[in-house]
Structure formats: structure tokens, C-alpha cells
Amino acid sequence: MARITVEDCLTKIPNRFQLVLAATYRARMLSQGHAPKVESKNKPGVTALREIAEGHVGLEMLRKVPV
């Protein structure tokens, strides 16, 4: 299994603060029962980072956050 790092995700979302917000929101969605977009047996936080690194999820996650 390949290890996922934040550096892998920073190529997709260059701003580290936006990266954390997007990953957190996606991880919360996964823990509430949403279907993952990648094959993963990891915890929601790691799965969210994998989705970002592979380009399945991006900054659009921040547009879905209720104000």
C-alpha cells in the first residue's frame, strides 16, 4: 500500500489551509456514510487525502460548506 502524504495533495490544492479544510469536510462526509471515490480500507481522513491526491476531490468541497 502506498503511503499518502500532504505533499502529494499540495500539488492539487497548493494552499495548505484550503487543503486541510477540504480534507476535513470530505472526511466528515465519509464518516457520515457518503460513498468513497477511491478504493480504500483506511479511516475517513486518509481516504479523503487519497481522493484529493488522485484528483477526485478538490476545492469544490469548500463551495459545498454551509455558511
UniProtKB/Swiss-Prot annotation:
UniProt-recorded Gene Ontology molecular function terms: DNA binding; DNA-directed RNA polymerase activity
Catalytic activity: RNA(n) + a ribonucleoside 5'-triphosphate = RNA(n+1) + diphosphate
InterPro entries in the cross-refs: DNA-dir_RNA_pol_omega, Pol_omega/Rpo6/RPB6, RPB6/omega-like_sf
Keyword Protease: no
GO biological process, one term: DNA-templated transcription
Keywords from the UniProt entry: DNA-directed RNA polymerase, Nucleotidyltransferase, Transcription, Transferase
Pfam family, one: RNA_pol_Rpb6
SUPFAM superfamilies, alphabetized: RPB6/omega subunit-like
Described purpose of this protein according to its UniProt entry: Promotes RNA polymerase assembly. Latches the N- and C-terminal regions of the beta' subunit thereby facilitating its interaction with the beta and alpha subunits.
Binding partners and assembly: The RNAP catalytic core consists of 2 alpha, 1 beta, 1 beta' and 1 omega subunit. When a sigma factor is associated with the core the holoenzyme is formed, which can initiate transcription.
Name recorded for this polypeptide: DNA-directed RNA polymerase subunit omega
